[in-house]
C-alpha cells in the first residue's frame, strides 16, 4: 500500500493508502472525509459470528509499517478464520490527528457500508493531557453512539507510553479503561503489552528512534493483541511473523494473548 504525506504523528498532512486500483467507493469515501486516509482490503464478506469487517480509525500509530490493519488481516488469514475473499478491513487516519478531528468523516465512512467493528485510536497524548482529554471523551461518546446506531461495535485502541516515560502506561490504561467502562465498549490493551515487552525484552525495540512511533515489532505486537482481543483466541503459533523471525514472533504472540487475558480478568 502506497502512502502519501508526512511520517509523523505530529504532522497535519493527510495520507491516502490503497491496495490495487481505487474503486469508486473508495474515491467517494476519500472525498467525503476530506483528507482522512482510507486503505482497502478484500470486498466480498460472508456473514458470521466473528467480526470480518473492521474499520481502524486513528493516526500514524495505526498506519506506520504499512499499516496495522494489514498485519492484523494477515494474522486472521494465517489462522484460517478468514480468507482474503471473506474479510475486509480499512484504515481512516489523519497524520497527527486527535480523535475529535475525525468528526467530519466518521459518520460518512461508517454509513457507506456495514462494519462489524470500528476501532478508535486517540492521539498518543489526547486522552491524558489537559485540554484534550475531555474532547477525546466527548468524541468517543459520540462516535460510539453513531456506531451502535448503525449496528457496529465500538472498540478502543489503548496506545503505549513513549520511551523514557513509563508513567504514561498507567495514565493511558486508566483513561481508556474508564471510557470503555462508561460506554460498555471493549478496550484492546496494546499499551500494556508494550509495557511488558519493554520490561522483559529490551532487545526487541517496539518504537523507532523518535521514541513514540511503532517499529515493525511494535506494529506486529499491536496486531497480535487485536487478534487475541477481537477473536478471544491465542495468536500463538500462527505462521505469519512479519519477517521478524519465528522466535521473536512467538514471544510477541504470547505476550499479546497473556495481556488480553490479564486485562479481561481485572
Annotated model-derived regions:
Residues 38, 213, 223-266:
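Conserved catalytic region of serine esterases and O-acyltransferases that act on ester linkages
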Residues 53-57, 62-137:
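Conserved SGNH/GDSL esterase-like catalytic core that processes O-acyl groups on lipids
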Residues 4-24:
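Bacterial N-terminal signal peptides that target proteins for export
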Residues 48-52:
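A short, charged/proline- and glycine-enriched loop
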Amino acid at each position: 500500500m502506497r502512502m502519501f504525506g508526512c511520517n509523523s504523528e505530529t504532522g497535519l498532512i493527510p495520507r491516502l493508502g490503497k491496495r490495487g486500483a481505487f474503486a469508486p467507493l473508495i474515491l467517494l469515501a476519500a472525498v467525503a472525509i476530506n483528507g482522512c486516509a482510507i486503505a482497502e482490503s478484500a470486498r466480498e464478506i460472508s456473514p458470521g459470528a466473528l467480526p470480518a469487517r473492521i474499520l481502524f480509525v486513528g493516526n500514524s500509530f495505526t498506519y506506520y509499517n504499512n499499516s496495522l490493519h494489514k498485519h492484523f488481516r494477515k494474522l486472521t488469514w494465517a489462522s484460517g478464520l478468514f480468507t482474503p475473499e471473506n474479510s475486509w478491513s480499512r484504515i481512516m487516519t489523519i497524520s497527527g490527528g486527535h480523535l475529535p478531528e475525525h468528526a467530519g468523516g466518521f459518520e460518512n465512512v461508517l454509513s457507506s457500508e456495514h462494519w462489524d467493528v470500528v476501532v478508535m485510536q486517540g492521539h498518543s497524548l489526547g486522552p491524558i493531557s489537559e485540554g484534550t482529554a475531555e474532547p477525546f471523551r466527548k468524541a468517543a461518546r459520540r462516535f460510539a453512539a453513531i456506531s451502535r446506531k448503525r449496528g457496529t461495535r465500538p472498540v478502543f485502541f489503548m496506545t503505549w507510553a513513549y520511551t523514557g516515560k513509563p508513567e504514561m502506561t498507567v495514565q493511558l490504561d486508566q483513561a481508556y479503561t474508564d471510557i470503555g467502562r462508561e460506554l460498555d465498549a471493549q478496550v484492546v490493551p496494546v499499551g500494556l503489552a508494550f509495557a511488558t515487552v519493554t520490561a522483559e525484552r529490551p532487545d526487541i525495540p517496539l518504537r523507532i528512534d523518535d521514541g513514540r512511533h511503532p517499529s515493525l515489532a511494535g506494529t506486529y505486537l499491536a496486531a497480535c493483541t487485536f487478534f487475541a482481543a477481537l477473536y478471544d483466541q491465542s495468536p500463538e503459533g500462527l505462521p505469519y511473523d512479519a519477517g521478524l523471525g519465528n522466535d521473536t514472533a512467538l514471544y510477541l504472540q504470547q505476550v499479546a494473548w497473556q495481556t488480553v487475558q490479564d486485562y479481561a480478568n481485572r
